[in-house]
Amino acid sequence: MMQSKSFRKLGVMAVGAAAMVSTALSDAAAQAKDKFVYGVPSAISSAIANFVFAKELGYFDQENIDMQMVPLAGSAVIIPQLLSNQIQAAGASLEPLVIARQPGKANFPLKFVYNYLRNSVWEFAVTANSPVKTVADLRGKTIGIVSLGSGNVYTTRAILAAAGVPWDQVKVLAVGFGVQAFEALRSDQIQMLNLWESAHASLEVAGTPLRRLEYPAQFQGVSSHGFEVTDALLKDNPGLIARFGRAASKGSVACIANYEGCLKAFWKHYPEQKPKVGTEEEILRKELAIMVPRMQNIGYFAPGQPKRWGEYAERDWTVLIAALKAGGEVTDENIPLSSLYTNALVPEYNKFDSAAVEAQAKAWK
């Protein structure tokens, strides 16, 4: 009898232990975060400080997301990574997908789900003392671009045409970016540099005063980049995209509320990105001058426009399609806009208390 009782007791203990293990495994499974790899369309820099600040403040944790970032250069790399599910989303320029919708083109099963860079990052920069005062003054001048295959060239061409400057009335020189591009402008090899805002800011920080030419009105305040995902992910797991977009939106709000804290959080996670030369105050001032213009383009909303993070306007696409047609890349303008983007998840992106996020950001030390 004693032996029988002992066996019964051991049996109860074993069942209890098994139940505890099962519960623990269930809890662990419930707590496992969803992996989300975001493709950064450039090298790691303070341009992604808003994502890092979002991680630092716990916004991705709150959405149960393990967010990772990988630098990727150009659509030739980004698109295969998306299609092979190596990354879940990418910050991508809009042009390649529009071109892919043309007859005979690849017609990739991709879609933009979030308007990220709400105001184009591309600028027309001239030296501060340049005789070029308007876009119309570029007739007969040489303009510097990243490469002849750069996606923004089509819009540049359309902007010049709108100002009465035919493409064959300017010279175009591929200068890359960085030292060689800046030297081309300083030496008057080119009279206008057509890079993105943070690249131009870097040149100014290095000691070359610049002036930006004003775009024609129809090209102002239109998107240049967004979050691109596969149609399959959008169909199968829209909730994951919504959670990612909400955390990213909160990161943007937080960074804009506390630029200095946002930059310091970026350096905390990427210490190798912090410049080594200069005093702490000088380093902070110079890097903020580079970072802030990017955050302003992320947070751009036209006067009176509802502040709905991630939302596209139809104009973002119609202006681009017209520009690509002017550049010869689009022959058929009748592209269903629903094949390019969706605003379906915008309400989910904006389900948070902006004031609370701003307060948390300002309190971060």
Q: What annotation goes with each model-predicted range?
A:
Residues 130, 180-280:
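Pocket-lining segment of extracytoplasmic ligand-binding domains
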Residues 31-197, 208, 213-221:
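Short, glycine-/small- and polar/acidic-enriched structural segments
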Residues 20-28:
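C-terminal segment of classical bacterial N-terminal signal peptides
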Residues 237-330:
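Secondary-structure end/capping motifs
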Residues 2-14:
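Bacterial N-terminal signal peptides that target proteins for export
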Residues 7, 134-135, 337:
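Structural motif detector for alpha-helix initiation sites
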Residues 68-69, 281-290, 335-347:
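Short linear loop/turn motifs
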Residues 314-365:
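Conserved C-terminal helix/tail region of periplasmic/extracytoplasmic solute-binding proteins
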